[in-house]
Amino acid sequence: KVKTFAFLQIVVLIALSLHLASAGSKQLIGPQSSTNSIKAEFCDTNCTAGTNGIWNGCSGDCFCTHVGNSTEGRCMKITGFDEYPTSEAEE
């Protein structure tokens, strides 16, 4: 019984140490850093689907997003994805 109890104490201490070590490392580093992250934001304009099925109203880097079969949507812009390699660059 004593050996089993001692073993369980050691296991609990190791688990607690691992948890505390990982909980203390909240720094943003590497590819998960917020400076390297992809950012999505809404543009100032809305968009609509024309009778020809082409979406109108977004300009610049913005594109139209909509829900389901709605003919109205909101313009959105995504930035930061150019910092990541493409599948062609990895080959």
UniProtKB/Swiss-Prot annotation:
Question: Where are the annotated glycans?
Answer: 46, 69
Which cysteines pair up through disulfides? They are 43-62, 47-64, 58-75
Main localization of the protein? Answer: secreted
Question: Does the record bear Secreted in its keywords?
Answer: yes
Localization: Secreted
The residues the entry assigns to the signal sequence are 1-23
| Gene Ontology cellular-component terms listed | extracellular region
> Under the GO molecular function aspect, what terms does this record hold?
C-X-C chemokine binding
- Which terms are listed as keywords in the entry? Disulfide bond, Glycoprotein, Secreted, Signal
Q: Where on the tree of life does the source sit, at the highest rank?
A: Eukaryota
Q: What does this protein do?
A: Salivary chemokine-binding protein which binds to host chemokines CXCL1, CXCL2, CXCL3, CXCL5, CXCL6 and CXCL11.
Q: Per its record, how is this protein called by name?
A: Evasin P1077
Q: Organism, per UniProt?
A: Ixodes ricinus
